[in-house]
Amino acid sequence: MADTEPMKVPFSDHRIATKGQSTVDEAVRTLRSLWRQHGVPEALLCIGTDRSTGDALGPLVGTEIETQLPRLKVLGTLNHPVHAGNLEDVLRNYPDLTQKRLLAVDASLGRLQDVGTLLIRLGPLRPGSGVNKQLPPLGHYHITGTVNVGGFMEYFVLQNTRLALVMQMASFISLALAASLNP
């Protein structure tokens, strides 16, 4: 899977109700293939904040995975979020983090037809790009979830993103990650 060829996982309430498990299985297969080709992640960096509904995707995933996979180093939870304001401090406090096989998880903004879509990609995440922030690229691979439409008043859009969608996407990502990382 090249950096230019992300695995798109369409996601909606309808898919959860009718085909959710097969969609989770598809994501698990994709993640396991990625792990076989490029190595299992040694750490998980979940970017975002619980102070913004749309930006809470990362910390929700981090909190869930920290419980499900206690052996995996997880940074970025609801209790200890990693966001634009503290990212450089976190990187300074964990200097070996960038040397590990790192999986980054973050929310993103995109086109209307992509809302609810998860992207699984090889290569670094560029956090903050949806809100025009210049932050260092992170991760050997990443998962982003398009939580709302971007392009105009991004901070307002993130604040007014449906919590139900963000929580369902976080649950989906957590299920797929836990299944893909458990033997």
Where are each of the predicted segments found?
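N-terminal catalytic or cofactor-binding beta/alpha core of small enzyme domains
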Residues: M1-L102, A107-P183
